C-alpha cells in the first residue's frame, strides 16, 4: 500500500522555496553539557533559564535554552542574533557533520532522492558552499532568467559568487543522556535536537525581482508547491524594510504561482519566537495556502497568536489529543484551509472538511507513507533512494499507538466532528535515531505529495 502510493507520488513535479542553509551538527553527550554548565556556573544557568531568553545574544543565553530543551526532551529552535558569537561556537564545538539544512533544501534533496519526476528549488541566496549541498540528481533544478527566458539549471551550476551563507548549528541529543545542574540530576527523556538558527540581516526571504514575472510559468509547470522559511523574516531591517514588506511580497508570490491554475500550495510552519511576527505570518499567508503542516507546539503558538490563549496553554501543558483536535478545527475554519496536518512524536493527524475529495481511508494511507518515510530517515540519517522506504516499513509503531487511537476516538465523541474528516495514525518511532533533523519536513513532504497524487488520480488536481 505504502510502496504503491510512493510510486504514484513520484510522478509529480514539485516547486519548493525559500530557505536553505548549512547545518553544522553536534552530537551531544553528557560530558559536553556538563562542561558548558560548569563554565558559567549552575546558579547563573538556572537564573537565565527562568528569564527564558527568546533569542541568543550571548553564550549564557544559549546554555540556558539548551539545558531547558534537554530537561523537557522537546525539540526547540532559538534565533542567534549576534554574529560575533560565531567565533565562540566554533571554539567550543567540533562539528560532527555539515550538511544541507533549511526546510526547502531538505525537502528538495528528499524529493530528488525519491526520484520525483521534477523538483524545482528556489532560494534567494545560492553561494557555492550551499549549492554543493544539493544532491547531484538529473531531476533537481534551480530557476534562473537568461536572455529574458526562464531557464532551469542544476543548483551546482547556478551558484553566485559573493552570496551569503547561513549556518545553523544543530545539537542532537539522545534520550538517557545525563548531567547535573547543581544538585539536580537531569536525564533527557526523549531524543531530539536544539537548533541555534542564524538570523542575520544579510539573509532574507524573498524572490528576486527578475524571477518573479516567471512564477506563473513555474506554477503552471508543477503539480504543487511547498513553501517555508518565513520564520527567517525580521520585524525590521536597518535599510527601512520590515516584515510587512516581505510578507506582501510573499503573498504576491503565492498569487503569482496560482495565476495560471489553482496550484495546491503547502506552507510548512516553523516556530516563530516573536508573537507579532507569528501573527503577521498567520494572517497574511495561511488564507492563501491550501495545506499547512506543523507540530503540536507550533499549533499552540498559532492558537495563542489568534487569541485562543487558554486552549494554547492546555496544549502546551497537557498535550491532550482532544485539545489538538479542537485547535485544528479552529485553524482549519478560520484560515479556510483544505487540509491541516499536525505531527508529533507519537502521532500524525489530518483535519479536513467533510467535503474533501479524499476518503478517510485515503487520508490514512497518506499519513502511513509520511511516517514510514520519516522512520527511514531517522534510521539512516538521510534517504538516498526510494527503495529505502523498506527500512521504514520494518520500524514498529510506537508503544503508545493503541492509547493514541483510544484518546482520538474519545475526542471525536466529545467534539462536534460531523463537518470534518479526522484521521490519526501512530508514528513509527525509531528508538535510537541516527538523526532527528528534517523529520517533520519529511513527514509533511510525504503527506502533501501523496495527498496530491491521490487528488490527481481522482481528477481533482
Curated annotation (Swiss-Prot):
Function summary: Catalyzes the phosphorylation of fructose 6-phosphate to fructose 1,6-bisphosphate using ADP as the phosphate donor.
Main subcellular location: cytoplasm
Top-tier EC class: transferase
Pfam families linked to this entry: ADP_PFK_GK
Cofactor binding remark: Binds 1 Mg(2+) ion per subunit.
Stated family: Belongs to the carbohydrate kinase PfkC family.
Pathway stated in the Swiss-Prot or TrEMBL entry: Carbohydrate degradation; glycolysis
Highest taxon listed in the record's lineage: Archaea
EC number(s) per entry: 2.7.1.146
Keywords annotated in UniProt: Cytoplasm, Glycolysis, Kinase, Magnesium, Metal-binding, Transferase
Protein name: ADP-specific phosphofructokinase
Reaction catalyzed: beta-D-fructose 6-phosphate + ADP = beta-D-fructose 1,6-bisphosphate + AMP + H(+)
HAMAP family: ADP_PFKinase
GO biological process, one term: glycolytic process
Binding site for Mg(2+): 268, 298, 441
UniProt GO cellular component terms: cytoplasm
Cofactor(s) listed in the protein's UniProt record: Mg(2+)
